[in-house]
From Swiss-Prot:
It comes from the Bacteria. Residues 100-173 form the PRC barrel domain. This is Ribosome maturation factor RimM. Binds ribosomal protein uS19. InterPro entries: PRC-brl_dom, PRC_barrel-like_sf, RimM, RimM_N, RimM_N_sf, Transl_B-barrel_sf. The gene is rimM. Its main location: cytoplasm. GO terms for biological process: ribosomal small subunit biogenesis; rRNA processing. Keywords: Chaperone, Cytoplasm, Ribosome biogenesis, rRNA processing. An accessory protein needed during the final step in the assembly of 30S ribosomal subunit, possibly for assembly of the head region. Essential for efficient processing of 16S rRNA. May be needed both before and after RbfA during the maturation of 16S rRNA. It has affinity for free ribosomal 30S subunits but not for 70S ribosomes. One of its GO terms (molecular function) is ribosome binding. The keyword Chaperone applies. Belongs to the RimM family. One of its GO terms (cellular component) is cytoplasm. It comes from Rhizobium etli (strain CIAT 652).
Length: 193
């Protein structure tokens, strides 16, 4: 853990540390990788306060992984990490393993959500999974964030190069009535009379 402080440019959340496991400094962690034990394949993990963590050992246990980090040698040191989120730089994720229609959730943040008429419904500010399917958080200028389902019905197309998502506002729950679509223009200011 005595690595130099690291400031990440484009951090991607990889794991959240839970409680201590045993007396040797091991911790339980929730890994956000397809294969939880692959967490060790990404090199050093970093906290947002700049600390760097090297995984020495990792094993699966029920719904978590048990991890031993260099420099964390006793239960007290392990307990001090409870709740800490660990990140890697986005550039460290392997793009060559992705199919043409695959992407990382981190790549969705910042995309503008538009309908087929070009009306903007906001920018993606987060991707969440609360257990009933993935949700995208959209936030427009001066508006409260809204969550829409991240499904084929709601999100029709993702264009990372153009920085846009094509959405169906009706399927996404942003409008209740198809007739409202012609009236709804959230990205255009109202005209003064």
């Amino acid at each position: 853990m005595k690595e130099p402080m690291t400031k990440l440019e484009n951090p991607v959340l990889m794991a959240t540390i839970g409680g201590a496991q045993g007396l040797r400094g091991e911790v339980r962690a929730k890994a956000y990788t397809a294969d939880p034990t692959a967490l060790g394949d990404y090199g050093h993990l970093h906290s947002m306060d700049g600390r760097s963590f090297e995984i020495l050992e990792i094993r699966e246990m029920k719904n978590v992984v048990v991890v031993r980090f260099r420099g964390i040698n006793d239960r007290n040191a392990a307990e001090a990490l409870n709740g800490l989120e660990l990140y890697i730089e986005r550039d460290n994720l392997p793009d060559e393993e992705l199919e043409d229609d695959e992407f990382y959730y981190a790549d969705l943040e910042g995309l503008e959500a538009r309908d087929d008429q070009g009306v903007s419904y906001g920018t993606v500010t987060g991707v969440f999974d609360f257990g009933a399917g993935d949700l995208l958080e959209l936030k427009g200028p001066g508006k409260r964030p809204v969550l829409i389902p991240f499904s084929e019905a709601s999100v029709l197309e993702i264009d990372l190069e153009a920085g846009t998502l094509l959405i169906d506002p009706l399927a996404a729950g942003l409008v209740d009535d198809p007739e409202e679509l012609s009236k709804f223009t959230p990205d255009k200011p109202k005209k003064k009379k």
